Amino acid sequence: MIGFSNVMKALINYDKPITLHNNITKITIPSNSYNNDMSHLNMRGFPALEELIIGSNCFGGVNSLILNEMNGIESIVIGESSLFNTSSIMLVDLPLLDHVEMREDALYGGGSNSSLMLVNLPSLRRINSNGNSLVELRNLIVISDW
């Protein structure tokens, strides 16, 4: 099986533009994945992506999460204890994003300067936070052009 990080590297580093990412409508990250692979996760430019599901206990080493320029995304689900140590979360220019669900201990927080930035999310109706999600959040920044 090709790992998610290898697919991302292939999409980003290929000499000629690849349009595979233009047709992906759903990404599901299996539980217990990518805990030591990266310190920053920046996902952008998946124009057809409608749903992002991150399983439980994923991306344990990620300090910052940026989701941006995904014009079709409607739903983000972050599984239990995923992105546990993340201190910076940015959701930017996601015009159709309707809701974000964070399960128990997801995005717990990465210390005294943890921040959540929401920029240009005109369709956002709800953020569900279960249990200890966002428990160490210190800064909430909302910027809107709508």
Language-model segment annotations:
Residues 27, 41, 52, 65, ...:
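Conserved hydrophobic beta-strand positions in leucine-rich repeat
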Residues 7, 24, 38, 49, ...:
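Conserved hydrophobic position(s) of the canonical leucine-rich repeat
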Residues 1-4, 127-130, 138-146:
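Leucine-rich solenoid repeat scaffolds
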Residues 10, 15-73:
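LRR N-terminal entry segment and analogous cap-like coil->beta motifs
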Residues 102-115:
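Acidic/polar low-complexity surface segments
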Residues 30, 55, 68, 79, ...:
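Feature marks extracellular polysaccharide-active and adherence modules
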